[in-house]
Amino acid sequence: MKLAIVKYNAGNIQSVIYALNRLGIEPVLTDDVDELRSADKVLFPGQGEASNAMNYLRSKGLDQVIKDLKQPVFGICIGQQLLCEHSEENNTDCLGIIPAKVKKFPPLDKVPQIGWNTVTELKSPLFKGIAEESYVYFVHSYYVESNAYQIATTNYILPYACALQKDNFYAVQFHPEKSSDVGEQILKNFIEL
Amino acid sequence: MLTKRIIPCLDVKDGKTVKGVNFLNLRDAGDPVELGALYSQQGADELVFLDITATLEKRGTLVELVKRVAQHINIPFTIGGGIGSIEDVSACLNAGADKVSVNSSAIKNPALIDQLSKEFGNQCIVVAIDTRNVGGMNLVHSHGGTKPTDLDTIAWAKEMQERGAGELLLTSMDKDGTKAGFANELTAYISTHVSIPIIASGGAGTMEHFTDVFTLGKADAALAASIFHFKEIAIPELKSYLSGKGIHMRK
């Protein structure tokens, strides 16, 4: 199986690569259009700031390439937020693949949310074998509002969409590559889709 | 619900784990990656690796350690020790670290924190603060707690948040190595006067001390070293004890 990771200016890609290596996968990190199109699966991970990431993707023409992908695509963290329509982070228009909005946590508790929180209302093959109320690791200041494409919910300050699925596009806000055995199972589920 | 976090800290010198009492008299406690993996299996929520190697090839040894940890461990970890530039941070994050901890370099040049958070996002920038009570004042200390500064700890904590720290690692030099409990009063004061998470460090000796730091100390996470390394407290028992006290823990 050929798994490609979208190469762009967002950080912390190495952890995802190591997590895939532990599952026996050697991913290709690439911004080459043909390589992305011909991969069996595409991962779109990263940490970073939304407007910088979108500007970079547009400057390389990767925005259109990602939108046109037909194989399973998995957005992680900022990757999830970029698949949405719009982010409040520097008022950024995102890829618009999933009709959902990204908002900043209201300052009613500590922001960023850093640490382990539960996932509930699990609704996708992505969560095969994952128990309700399992713990996964989050680090983020912006969240995706509840919407029709939500496949899991987390509650921090308010309930929000910690995972999304629309057609071949899957996404999670948390870091499966850092979420111990639960995260490993979710990555495995994506690989086996 | 977001859980409180238990974080073993591994002080690493020349590739091996060490733990000092009041930051002196280092003792050898084994291979950091093996120890980290063991803690991860036992339910540690995160790990902190502080590299106290003082060589010219500093960044090289840091990055090597980060790579080994990231390859073998599937929970988040922070790397610290002599990190002083955008290049250092970039090298550590690219090698697989989730967060970096900055201490003396922020004291020397506070604007570094603005630069780092702008470049990498505040979620991965931890500012470590070593504090000691000097004549009734809580003062920040630099260089592994050896050099006093004239910075007031509370004012410094607020400034670091404003400049873009995503988390504060507060070590009480008065408590560190004493096993007499965390600095709960100071931790609580800072935790309620900033809006970012606080990791409390220094003084853990009993399981009750952890209850206290999460309740009285209002800490978001608690860090300890020797009590874990020398098997005085086991993480699974600690977490089940804290759950029993009504403190939300990852199971």
Curated annotation (Swiss-Prot), chain B:
GO terms for cellular component: cytoplasm. One of its GO terms (biological process) is L-histidine biosynthetic process. Pfam families: His_biosynth. Pathway: Amino-acid biosynthesis; L-histidine biosynthesis; L-histidine from 5-phospho-alpha-D-ribose 1-diphosphate: step 5/9. Coiled coil: none annotated. It comes from the Bacteria. It is found in: Cytoplasm. Its main location: cytoplasm. Its EC number is 4.3.2.10. GO terms for molecular function: imidazoleglycerol-phosphate synthase activity; lyase activity. It catalyses: 5-[(5-phospho-1-deoxy-D-ribulos-1-ylimino)methylamino]-1-(5-phospho-beta-D-ribosyl)imidazole-4-carboxamide + L-glutamine = D-erythro-1-(imidazol-4-yl)glycerol 3-phosphate + 5-amino-1-(5-phospho-beta-D-ribosyl)imidazole-4-carboxamide + L-glutamate + H(+). The active site is at D11, D130. Keywords: Amino-acid biosynthesis, Cytoplasm, Histidine biosynthesis, Lyase. Belongs to the HisA/HisF family. IGPS catalyzes the conversion of PRFAR and glutamine to IGP, AICAR and glutamate. The HisF subunit catalyzes the cyclization activity that produces IGP and AICAR from PRFAR using the ammonia provided by the HisH subunit. Heterodimer of HisH and HisF. This is Imidazole glycerol phosphate synthase subunit HisF. The lineage of its organism: Bacteria, Pseudomonadati, Bacteroidota, Cytophagia, Cytophagales. The gene is hisF.
